[in-house]
Amino acid sequence: MKRIALLIALFLTAVFTVSAQKVTVSAEGQPAAAVFRTLIEQTGKNFVYSSDILEGVNVTVKVTNRPLKKVLAEMFEGTGIEFKIKGNDVMLKRSPKPQTAKPVAPRPMLETLTFELDTNATLLQEVVVVSRLEQPAVATSEIGAKKITADEVRSTPVLFGEADVIKALQMQPGVVEGTEGMAGMHVHGGEGDQNLYMLDNVPMYQVNHFAGLFSAFNTDIIRYIDFFKSSMPAKYDGRLSSFMDVRLQNGSFDGHHGSLRLGLTSGAFNFSGPIGKKTTYVVGLRRSWYDVLTVPMLALINSKEDEKIRFQYYFMDLNAKVTHRFSSRATAFASVYFGDDMLKTGSKDNLYDGYDGSTEDDRYDFHWGNLVAQAGLNYRINPQMSAEFTAAYTRFFSDMRHRDTYRAKTDDGKPLTTEERMRTDNNINDWIFRGDFDWQPMDGSRVRFGANYVRHSFLPARTSRLSVTETSRIETRDSTWAYGANELNAYIEDDWRISDRFSANAGIHASLFCIDGKAKHGISPRLSMSYRPNENFAVKAAYSRATQYVHQLSQTYLALPTDQWIPITGKFKPQTSDKIAIGGYWESGNKVWAASVEGYYKWMRHLLDYRDEYYLKPPLEMWNARLTQGSGTAKGIDLKVEKVYGKLTGHISYSLAWADRKFADKNGGQPFPARFDNRHTINVLLNWTVSDRVQLNAAWTGHSGNRFTLLSQMWEGPDCEAPLRAKVNNYQLPFYHRLDLSCVVKNRRGFWTFSLYNAYCHLNTIAIRRAYKEVRQMTEYGYVGTSVPVFQKVKLLPIIPSISYTWQF
């Protein structure tokens, strides 16, 4: 009996504790969803509801240290919304309408009553519960901001059926992909290195696999992606074009869950769940198996040829995250990401050079990757302020090894061996310490501020060479240029709802970059304003400045391990940009349709590029002697029409854009179009939910061709030939277009994904290469063959089908 009484007492104590949880809230005419954020921070509870029931619901409440149950009752009084607190969840629903009942019989009867049902009964429509993670564009002051869920990423058909974050963003207006099939991204006339990629707020320098065919983000464990391209939050700086923060899932307390995905080119596994009552975990692993698939193919090729081909490649992504809840006010987290690429290529030839059994073995080994680790604490200081403190480490490394071995035997049988070896590596190591605060000083105002310190360590290039013969051994090392830099950033911004119609976001970001005993600084003001004359329409304007201290040196537009990240040193100045944007936004009354038009103009200064004839510089010349700084502009208009809800969703967008560059040491100092000066870009994305089991997806993209420099003349010397100077980016490729399709079929345990890349097999031209054609000409001595230079179009990817299966458990 005592045990029963004790259990009852414990139960009543728990119920009393939950119902008596105290909160402090002050809001006047604010949207209910906004007030929920305050309640979540103070109680840690989850609010479960359909977003439809809160449309247009504004609440006024001002309480101090009152039970949550009483606060909710006061908030929803007279709104027709009911709530129920169950465990850690607060569930909301509409109150049922009162109904009038009429007795079937006038008095108690002991008789059998027979009813006939109408066969033409009215069937109720299915109840669809929808949730929208991001606020509609008309409700915010931001321009060019987008929040994308993992489901939206998976609904974008891509190459090899690999759901890809960056390729999903390529479907947004103002964003172009660069080279076909690659995960590069060029935003509003910017370069590929002007985008800041972050994983849970930690920067990453290399976000691609296999020259950019795949990005480094495993969609299976992603929660959502924040993307900014016009009005930049003051929190972010360091890049000129865009900011992308990929947020990972947290583990769940409601049991262990996971999935296993098997595809033609890769597989992935993820698992999550609780560890005790206060800790959760999530683990994700993705690996390609090109190294396995190429084994039988190479075995067949090498069995028939004297030349033996060597090719082996794989990539891997590993994510792990642990979250621990100390109390409703404090939560700690730790996470790690490791991305790894390995490429081995080369050949072994039998030579016929007069020596017995002579062979040449030529090998290249590439190894590159990322490591990101962080630990942090979220802490609610008081009902109006919360903070996050983080320590992080991010590293990019790249290593290339080349070995060329020649073996033979002399006439007297003595072995003859020569070997040439070369090793080149570059890396970046950053230690990051940051503190971010979120403060709500009064109704309608949300202030964010913080600071961070970064210790950079750059090793742009380190090369060693070894030459070995039977009688000598010569080893050389190129000069190593290593840099250490200290970076300090601070920011503050206020997201202010001035009135029901006016809102604004004003902030400033200050930065200091110290290297080689010199300090460089940047002040980046940010301002965006919105006027909303009615519930369905808004007009916005924004200005932002950005400063960039690190840059990527690349001689191609592919994501290669030989690309180098270097800091601003010596005479070079940090890149800066100033951007203005205006836009109009509309949303239908039923929240199903949305449309927007945005215009922008961007000025860029101190851009870095290789100067003309940089290849004539001595090989060991300092890298900065080959560079020059200049300026650029970008302008354009982005239009978008979007259907948000329903069985058929998607969007159509069109961009009209111009982008140019001007360098004193390029193109004779005259302006020239940027490589990705794509005048017209059209994107169409459609998602059709055919039934509960089947979904069809289609993505069509088309844009004006990329530009590049076509050299029409060559200077031939006695020992070499070199191109004569031509106008930079003087040729434009043909119009690019492609259709991708996918179909998702669900079953009880998981789902199949069938995809078709380049469905109508249009071979797009991605480059022009110089070749030589043999031409026979009649002379006085008869026909004579000569080589004539010609230009050939390079076309890459035809129609490519793929299939994968995901098992969920």
Protein language model regions, located:
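Gram-negative outer-membrane beta-barrel transporters
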Residues: Y601-W603, A625-L710, T806
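Transmembrane beta-barrel wall of Gram-negative outer-membrane proteins
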Residues: G263-R287, K304-T345, D365-A387, Y393, ...
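Flexible loop and strand-edge segments within Gram-negative outer membrane beta-barrel domains
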Residues: R329-R380, R395-N427
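Surface-exposed extracellular loop regions of Gram-negative outer-membrane beta-barrel proteins
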Residues: M342, F397, R462-L466, E535-I580, ...
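N-terminal export/assembly leaders
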Residues: F16-V104, A145, V187
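Outer membrane beta-barrel strand-and-loop segments of large Gram-negative receptors
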Residues: D430-R434, D478-G484, N489, K573, ...
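Periplasmic N-terminal accessory/gating domains of Gram-negative outer-membrane beta-barrel systems
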Residues: R107-E116, E126-Q135, A139-D193, N201-M232, ...
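C-terminal beta-signal and adjacent terminal beta-strands/loops
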Residues: V292, R693, G702-D719, V744-F809
